[in-house]
Amino acid sequence: MTNKDESVEKNTESTVEETNIKQNIDDSVEQAEESKGHLQDEAIEETSDENVIEEIDPKDQKINELQQLADENEEKYLRLYAEFENYKRRIQKENEINKTYQAQRVLTDILPAIDNIERALQIEGDDETFKSLQKGVQMVHESLINALKDNGLEVIKTEGEAFDPNIHQAVVQDDNPDFESGEITQELQKGYKLKDRVLRPSMVKVNQ
């Protein structure tokens, strides 16, 4: 190869190298410009957000405060309303209980009078005047018992029933083959309940 050819080859290589270097520089400049642009955009966005935060309308702030106050008052109202409803239910329940048993003392005081009327009805007589009087007493007794039953009074069942210490009072033991052991063979005095509460237990004779 001649000196001329070598010179041409070197010039060509230099030109290619310069071109590559220039291209790299251009690429770097372009990337730098893009990065700068992104940074500027981000800075503008941050500045814009700060301005939005700083420039809250006083009216909007007042509305937010009023809304918060309204929410707090609503919560207080709901809590008070729930407490009031619970109070009403409790009072209503107490009133129902009092109403159910308000006649208990009066009925208890009436029971001895009923016993006396029933004893009088057991007396026998042939006189027409006596029979007429007894019939009148019987009508009064029936009316009284029906009125008391309408108010919750209930006669406790006895004869033939199994003895229950909760509603029966055993006075005498019996030995009757017609009844099972523990069954009531005879009622000595009537017992009464007011709904589910015993006013007076029945006095009974219980089979052994």
Curated annotation (Swiss-Prot):
Superkingdom as given in the UniProt entry: Bacteria
SUPFAM superfamilies with a match to the protein in the record: Coiled-coil domain of nucleotide exchange factor GrpE (SSF58014), Head domain of nucleotide exchange factor GrpE (SSF51064)
GO biological process: protein folding
InterPro entries, per the entry: GrpE (IPR000740), GrpE_coiled_coil (IPR013805), GrpE_head (IPR009012)
Function statement: Participates actively in the response to hyperosmotic and heat shock by preventing the aggregation of stress-denatured proteins, in association with DnaK and GrpE. It is the nucleotide exchange factor for DnaK and may function as a thermosensor. Unfolded proteins bind initially to DnaJ; upon interaction with the DnaJ-bound protein, DnaK hydrolyzes its bound ATP, resulting in the formation of a stable complex. GrpE releases ADP from DnaK; ATP binding to DnaK triggers the release of the substrate protein, thus completing the reaction cycle.
Subunit structure: Homodimer.
Protein name: Protein GrpE
Organism: Staphylococcus aureus (strain JH9)
Gene coding for it: grpE
